[in-house]
Amino acid sequence: MITLQRTPLFDVYAKYGGKTIDFGGWELPVQFSSIKEEHEAVRTAAGLFDVSHMGEVEVKGVDSLAFLQRVVTNDVSTLKVGGAQYTAMCYENGGTVDDLLIYKRGEEDYLLVINASNIEKDYEWLASHVIGDATVVNVSNEVAQLAIQGPKAEGILQKVVSEDLKEIKFFKFKNDILVDGIPALVSRTGYTGEDGFEIYCKSEDAAKLWEKLLEVGAEEGLKPCGLGARDTLRFEATLPLYGQELSKDITPIEAGIGFAVKPNKEADFFGKATLKEQKENGAPRKLVGIEVIERGIPRTHYPVFIGEEKIGEVTSGTQSPTLKKSIGLALIDVKYAAVDTEVEIEIRNKRVKAVVVPTPFYKRSK
């Protein structure tokens, strides 16, 4: 029997009605009240997520920048202390090792935040390519992460923070902020398509912080949220999920995150030749939005057809809680990727009519 890993908040889930599932070897809450209710709370008020299963790796040393420039696709040299950057790590063939966030805490001090299912693989990949005076340390077990997301997130978090949160702009952070007396790194980032913050603290402080935030946010409608709503929210915002929109067989260009690939940076990073070619001349496949016109919900790996030709497959799909439509993301042959192209999705051995639509499906009004 496989023992599932648990976050420092596991013992608190039951108090709030959390229903747990096995998520990539982690016992995590899929929902507390209902996915629809939690999704709605984040779009209209605020939601609190336990994201402590995510991995954290510290990269330090004189050669830390040179090392990161070699292993990630974005240009880390443009990052200033107090800034965050979204990027990817790729194999030499351009396939994706992982997508991640890099926080620059000091001139020779970076924190990498990686996907939970990839912690060991990513750490080994990084450690095996270290150059010069750079150190790579996996600190995942020492760090917990909470995400407070939604239009009311700032107001709620402000109640327990003395610094003015308005000063933390999008993709910026402050280190060593006291959140209700607990030292934390607070960044204006998220995975929902809404405004919000991700809070990194010591594992032993996570439960106290979780309870305090839910207490001070209750009157504004802050709800504890699970993986179900996290997935429907990120999907509507067209934010990729590793293992679905990204994988060792899918490049960042194909997945629509070409903005995080800088082939013109000086460093010869892994996958550079392939990604440069795809960025300049186009990739053979493209991630597109699809709306199902007939009955049926597109799910991961469902094949997409035009006539008898299979042109790709669905990577993610659901009945969108915000749009009340059956929509999906699909990786398809680029020659059929134009908006309004009519396609068919095979749902339970039956072909269902669908159409290519623009993405993101949802974009918050500023």
UniProtKB/Swiss-Prot annotation:
Give the Enzyme Commission number.
2.1.2.10
Q: Name one Pfam family in it.
A: GCV_T
Cystine links in this protein are none
Entry's Gene Ontology BP terms? glycine decarboxylation via glycine cleavage system
Output the Gene3D superfamilies linked to this UniProt entry. Answer: Aminomethyltransferase beta-barrel domains (3.30.70.1400), Aminomethyltransferase fragment (4.10.1250.10), Probable tRNA modification gtpase trme, domain 1 (3.30.1360.120)
What HAMAP family does this protein map onto? GcvT (MF_00259)
Q: Any idea what this protein is called?
A: Aminomethyltransferase
Q: What is the lineage of its organism?
A: Bacteria, Bacillati, Bacillota, Bacilli, Bacillales
